Every structure is written in structure tokens, then in C-alpha cells.
């Protein structure tokens, strides 16, 4: 399966379409939720120290590629409208490549797999235009 087919099919699980499957990493779903592809590698995602949650913390200025501006706009909209956030976790085929991503390389150039986390619901807890943090809670079943 190609990377494009993989990401498109994972967004469909949330009833969301990508504006451009070649570079989009976020979308507002028909359920008015922000659907976003996020890296599943530490240090960006980690377990909450005391609660059963996952925390994703990143900087928009670290992102490269055409999807950055669309993501920034969608993130601001999610903050303003208090949208729930639903993740699609991207995992590199070679985790050793992740340092390149942290160093600012374009993540679209690396082979990866996508996984829609349909039992995670997130809330934007920090968003200042550069830094952002999303805290995800787990649900056993989401209707």
C-alpha cells in the first residue's frame, strides 16, 4: 500500500478528507473534529506521568512541507472552536530516521505507516502559534 493510500484511508475512518493527499496532515471532519497526523515517536509523544493519557508536544516552526500552513490554520480553528482532536499516528519504518525529522527534515520523504487511533480523543491544552500540546484520553468504545 502506498503512503498516500494509507493516510487517506486512515483519515476516512474519521469521516475526513484531505485537501491534498500529497501534503495535507490535518483536516476538519464532517463531525467537526480536528483530525491530524502526528508522529508516534518519543520525545514528541509520551505517557502522562500520573494519568492514563498520552501527551503530544511539538513546535509548528519545526514542521516543514506544504501541510504546515494548513495545519497551523486548522489548529487555530480547533482552539477557537474548542474542537475535539482525533489522531492518526505516523510511525517511521526505520525509527532511527526520526532524529532527521526532529532536525527539521521533511517527513514526507521517509517510509512510514499510519494508524487512526479511533479510541483516542484529544484536547488542545497549549497553543501559542508556535508551541502546541494535545492531551489524549482513551475511550474503550466510541460510538
Task: Please describe what each predicted stretch is.
Residues 1-142:
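Short helix-coil boundary/hinge micro-motifs
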Amino acid at each position: 500500500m502506498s503512503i498516500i493510500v494509507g493516510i487517506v484511508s486512515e483519515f476516512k475512518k474519521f469521516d475526513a478528507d484531505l485537501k491534498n493527499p500529497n501534503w495535507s496532515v490535518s483536516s476538519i471532519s464532517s463531525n467537526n473534529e480536528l483530525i491530524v497526523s502526528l508522529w508516534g515517536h518519543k520525545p514528541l509523544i509520551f505517557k502522562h506521568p500520573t494519568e492514563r493519557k498520552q501527551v503530544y508536544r511539538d513546535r509548528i516552526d519545526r514542521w516543514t512541507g506544504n501541510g504546515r500552513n494548513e495545519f497551523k490554520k486548522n489548529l487555530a480553528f480547533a482552539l477557537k472552536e474548542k474542537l475535539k482532536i482525533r489522531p492518526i499516528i505516523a510511525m517511521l519504518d526505520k525509527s532511527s530516521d526520526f532524529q532527521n525529522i526532529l532536525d527539521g527534515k521533511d517527513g514526507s520523504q521517509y517510509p512510514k505507516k499510519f494508524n487512526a487511533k479511533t479510541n483516542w480523543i484529544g484536547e488542545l491544552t497549549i497553543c501559542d502559534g508556535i508551541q502546541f500540546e494535545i492531551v489524549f484520553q482513551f475511550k474503550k468504545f466510541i460510538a
